[in-house]
Each structure stands twice: as C-alpha cells, then as structure tokens.
C-alpha cells in the first residue's frame, strides 16, 4: 500500500546494486510487476550523473548507501553560512516535525513553505527532479538517517524481510 501512491504509469527505477544481490534480485520482480523502466547506473562514481540522466522515480539501495549520502549532505550543509545555514537548519527541523506529524505554527508553516521552495526543491533537482522515494533494504536503516533524508525532501521508506525467504516483503515509512 505504501508504494501505490508513488507508482505511476511505467515508473522509472535506477539501480546500481549487483543484480546477484538478493535485495536487488527481489526488486527486479517489483519492477516487472509494475511495468517499470529500469536504468542501470554505470558505476557508483557516476551515480549522480546517472540520476540526472534517468530521472528515477524510485531508487532502491542498502542502508550503507543512505548512510554515506547522509554524511556527504551533512558535510555540505555544515559549510553553509548566514541565511543559507539558517534555511538549512529550519528545513531539517520543520521537515522532521512534519514527518512525525507534529503541528506547525502559522509562522513555521510559512518558513516551511519557503524551505520547500528554496532548499528541498533544489535538493530534489540534484537527484533527477522526479524522485518519489528511496527504498532502503537489505538491513536496518538508521532512524536518524531516514528521518533526515525525509526532512530534506528525499522521501525514504524502510524495507524489511528475511534474506532466507525474501529480502524485502514490506515497507514502513520512517
């Protein structure tokens, strides 16, 4: 049910895990079931370029990928100064409030709207501009990483299952 709202007609997937990986192997069945277009990344070094070329709607990866992404984005965010730093901090803070369904004040709603237009939209564009969700699987995703990615406009789901039976049988929102 979590995937229904994000599955469009012929959704675009970008994959970079080895096809022999049990998680990726299972994801292939989903891609076939939803008649998705599948793009294969040339390499991890070219992943961002491939995302901009393929404009994926759904991307699956293991938690280590999202942990690395979290660290790289934080390095960039930590270099920000002045109003840019304030906007980034508000984007994360208010994004987490929205994620955890906490009520925003009128001022916070206005600031969150500004953050959406100036920060989150720019981040989304860096990931191809069409991303509807990341799906993490093959291990537990750190809640801090998942909530951070969601808060900055990169919707992230936590997939889970048993490798022995099937690596992903369901997804939870972070």
Can you say where each PLM-predicted feature lies in the sequence?
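Conserved AMP-binding/adenylation subdomain of ANL enzymes
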Residues: 1-12, 19-120
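Short, surface-exposed connector motifs at secondary-structure boundaries
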Residues: 10-12, 126-132
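Active-site glycine-centered loops adjacent to acidic/histidine catalytic or metal-binding residues
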Residues: 18, 138, 161
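Short active-site oxyanion
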Residues: 36-37, 131-134, 154
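Extended, domain-scale alpha-helical bundle/helix-rich regions
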Residues: 51, 134-135
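Active-site loops of AMP-binding adenylate-forming
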Residues: 141, 150-154, 162-174
